Design a protein with these regions (language model features):
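C-terminal His-loop and adjacent cap/lid subdomain of alpha/beta-hydrolase
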Residues: 29-475
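Secretory targeting and sorting signals
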Residues: 1-28
């Protein structure tokens, strides 16, 4: 194992709009010639960055994009976990990452902040032979953006638990589920679902909807309708601390979905919606004109819902018709355009990309991977993308070995003309086990579709159904 040591950071100097922390012996040099140590600095927009270089640097920089940070604290991070940092450094990788210019939904500057961090690393420490962008959660969306616009600076990408369908689909899938909870279990529009004036408003909505879900559990009809709402919100049918339910154990699947809601899932989602609406300039989600019968027909968990509705002697088609007829939430068009411009993926990859997901992720549904692969294929870049799945439950619940293996796989791909078997689960599993760390669980898996995707028509807003004079007003 390579020894890693930290060195003190000294005074900052300004260069090309970048404020840099420096070590006494630091001089720009190529690849492994750079001195080992810890570096820190800041960018012109206020983002801060850190970097760590090990003894025996192998010449590859891992540029880490971190996930959502509620704030107000906004520290820079250069690895997904302390254990992953130690393991990557021991493998000879250098690490770097920024805070982004602001906490919370930072997509307005995040990709630029990461590229600015790379520029600072090159100036202060040295030019890496290769740079691999590694992203986690919201940072997975950032690294996916770098895969599209970082050619010449980024050589390869690892996305983990990424919000790969982008901010519009993120808000829309969450809206679909919460709208169904309110409409089917309460029967009115008294709980605000969008356009919050503060995080406290979002928390109040989360509390009210969580209470509704709990009140539904004692009855068969309540559980069936809750299951429909949970399925529309892509809530996993496997929960932390529970055995994975059998494919046809629909009662256990519904209980797992309820465990996620009772455990506080909405208390993260709804206050976070406020922090997305603020930089976007309004509500970027909608359900007016959405056909919930069409969505249901494509749901991965529709068998569960059908079974529970039958057991409760409820009319599923009637409930779906009601959801469609009552849907009247409209977007603020500038917010949709902002999210589409800053917080989205097109699939137009420019570098090899490996995307990794647990199969039961409550905050970044594994269905995002299906949507991401669809976009990449439609853009004609399917040969650059590989996806890896882990038999685990929870958001970003990866082992250290899985993180290191994913980075090693992309580095190997950069030395070959194609992927070959590099990202096959058997190959990934064997590599992870060979590290002697904390194990791995790579499996063959095919995610279902993200049915909540709405096609954007930002170039022709007059053609959008809600833009017509007869459309219901926003609420």
């Amino acid at each position: 194992m390579r020894k890693f040591r930290f060195r003190a950071t000294y005074a900052a100097v300004a260069c090309a709009g970048i404020v840099l922390g420096t070590t006494a012996a630091a001089h720009p040099s190529a690849g492994p010639g750079a001195p080992a140590g810890h570096y820190a600095g800041s960018l012109a927009d206020g983002a801060t960055w850190i970097a760590d270089v090990p003894d025996g640097w192998n010449g590859t920089l891992v540029l880490f994009s971190h996930g959502y940070t509620p704030g107000p604290a906004n520290p820079p991070r250069d690895a997904p976990t302390p254990a992953a940092a130690a393991a990557l450094l021991a493998e000879g990788f250098a690490l770097a990452g920024s805070s982004y210019a602001q906490p919370a939904w930072a997509l307005g500057t995040a990709a630029d902040d990461q590229l600015g961090t790379l520029a600072a690393f090159r100036h202060q420490i040295g030019r890496p032979r290769t740079t691999i962008a590694l992203g986690q959660s919201m940072g997975g969306l950032v690294s996916a953006e770098l895969a599209e616009r970082g050619a010449g600076r980024i050589d390869g990408v690892v996305n983990t638990c990424g919000l790969l369908a982008g901010g519009v689909d993120l808000n829309n899938y969450q809206l679909d589920g919460q709208y169904a909870l309110q409409e089917l279990l309460l029967g009115n529009h008294d709980i605000p679902l969008v356009r919050y004036s503060s995080p406290a408003d979002g928390q109040a909505t989360a509390n009210a909807l969580t209470a509704l879900a709990g009140q539904a559990q004692p009855t068969a009809s309540g559980r069936a309708r809750f299951a429909l709402a949970a399925a529309l919100m892509n809530v996993p049918t496997w929960a932390v601390g529970q055995p994975q339910p059998a494919r046809d154990d629909y009662a256990a699947q519904e209980q797992a979905q309820y465990a996620w809601i009772a455990g506080g899932l909405l208390s993260f989602i709804d206050p976070a919606r406020y922090t997305i609406e603020q930089p976007a300039g309004g509500n970027g989600s909608w359900n007016i004109s959405v056909d919930y019968g069409d969505l249901f027909a494509r749901l991965p968990d529709r068998d569960e819902v059908v079974a529970l509705y039958r057991a409760a002697h409820l009319d599923l088609r009637a409930d779906l018709r009601h959801l469609t007829a009552a849907a009247d939430i409209t977007p603020d068009l500038p917010a949709v355009r902002w999210l589409d411009r800053t917080s989205n993926t097109t699939g137009r990859l420019t570098v090899p990309t490996l995307s990794m997901h647990t199969i039961a992720d409550q905050l970044a549904p594994v269905e995002f991977e299906h949507e991401y692969a669809r976009r990449v294929s439609a853009a004609g870049r399917g040969g650059l993308l590989r996806q890896a799945f882990v038999q685990a439950v929870g958001h970003c619940n990866f082992t250290t070995a899985e993180y290191v293996t994913a980075v090693r796989a992309v580095r190997e791909r950069l030395h070959r003309s194609g992927w070959g078997a590099i990202a096959d689960p058997e190959r990934l599993q064997a590599d992870a086990q060979s590290l002697g760390l904390d194990g791995a669980a790579f499996i063959h898996f095919r995610p279902g579709p993200l049915v909540n995707h709405r096609r954007l028509a930002a170039a022709r807003p007059e053609a959008w159904p809600w833009a017509a004079p007869a459309a219901s007003p926003a609420r």
